[in-house]
């Protein structure tokens, strides 16, 4: 039997307690109703939906401040969303996600009510790179829309997908945003050099962004690939425009991530860009 001493009631659904000298946050419907500091709760008489042990004092303070500015209905919907993500996403760490996602949804909801929408320029890149997280995020947004009687734009699906993906991938939110930005700029360079519009539903696009994502990961781990000299010469001579485009994109990646770029990397990216060129010639 787990016993918890109430140290603070944040609202009807959230209380801060101590358990064996460890401060925890208990979440459950009505769990905080009429609960006062010093009261003892036990898991045999109350329904606990989630127990969060936030590691740092900064996390604890931030979460408490968020809960205090959100009404109970919004907070319950966020709790339901966290439970859904925890039960659906693979390898998700709830205690890491609880603060960031609570923060994001509270302020996204406030902005929406004030008709302030932040555009997300990386929706397509996020959908392609993190398709599982994007699918889960779409279901979360559908649930939020229904429960709060609002209509979050598709931009928010992308934002929430990044929160989920950053929790399950070996990348931070900042790193994923950088990768999305590099991919978007890379596509801009391709469209300019090849005088075309890239079909973001195409297999060529999907292969390109996957290649760039894994290329950046490899380079940051200092894992390099090597192509034979005659193969390098052949590709440079056969596809000079695509080679030049690949060089521009990899130079941008080199500056953005402070990594070393080899001739072989340029060659393999050239081949991916050539697939776009082939599609243009076929149309």
UniProtKB/Swiss-Prot annotation:
Name assigned to this protein: Protein GlcT
Native organism taxonomy: Bacteria, Bacillati, Bacillota, Bacilli, Bacillales
Record's keyword terms, sorted: Repeat
InterPro entries: BglG_antiterminators (IPR050661), CAT_RNA-bd_dom (IPR004341), CAT_RNA-bd_dom_sf (IPR036650), PRD (IPR011608), PRD_sf (IPR036634), Transcrpt_antitermin_CS (IPR001550)
Annotated family: Belongs to the transcriptional antiterminator BglG family. GlcT subfamily.
Organism: Staphylococcus aureus (strain MRSA252)
Domain PRD: 69-173, 174-283
Gene Ontology MF, one: RNA binding
PANTHER family on file: CRYPTIC BETA-GLUCOSIDE BGL OPERON ANTITERMINATOR, PROTEIN GLCT
A Pfam family annotated for this UniProt entry: PRD
Transmembrane is among the record's keywords: no
GO biological process, one term: positive regulation of DNA-templated transcription
């Amino acid at each position: 039997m787990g016993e918890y001493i109430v140290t603070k009631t944040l609202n009807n659904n959230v209380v801060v307690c101590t358990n064996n000298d460890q401060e925890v946050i208990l979440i459950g419907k009505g769990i905080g109703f009429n609960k006062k500091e010093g009261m003892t709760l036990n898991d045999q008489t109350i329904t606990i939906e989630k127990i969060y042990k936030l590691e740092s004092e900064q996390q604890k303070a931030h979460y408490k401040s968020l809960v205090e500015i959100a009404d109970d209905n919004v907070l319950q919907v966020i709790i339901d969303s966290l439970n859904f993500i925890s039960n659906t996403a693979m390898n998700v760490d709830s205690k890491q996600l609880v603060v960031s996602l609570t923060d994001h949804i509270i302020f996204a909801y406030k902005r929406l009510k004030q008709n302030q929408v932040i555009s997300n320029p990386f929706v397509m890149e996020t959908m392609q790179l993190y398709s599982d997280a994007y699918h889960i995020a779409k279901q979360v947004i559908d649930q939020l829309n229904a429960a709060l009687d609002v209509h979050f734009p598709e931009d928010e699906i992308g934002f929430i997908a990044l929160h989920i993906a950053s929790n399950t991938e070996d990348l931070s939110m900042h790193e994923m945003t950088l990768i999305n930005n590099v991919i978007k700029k890379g596509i801009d360079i391709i469209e300019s050099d090849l005088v075309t519009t890239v079909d973001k539903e195409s297999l060529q696009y999907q292969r390109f962004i996957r290649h760039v994502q894994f290329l950046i990961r490899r380079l940051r781990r200092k894992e390099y690939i090597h192509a034979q000299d005659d193969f390098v010469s052949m590709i440079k001579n056969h596809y000079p425009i695509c080679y030049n485009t690949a060089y521009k994109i990899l130079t941008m990646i080199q500056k953005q991530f402070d990594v070393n770029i080899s001739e072989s990397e340029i060659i393999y990216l050239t081949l991916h860009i050539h697939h776009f060129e082939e599609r243009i010639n076929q149309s």
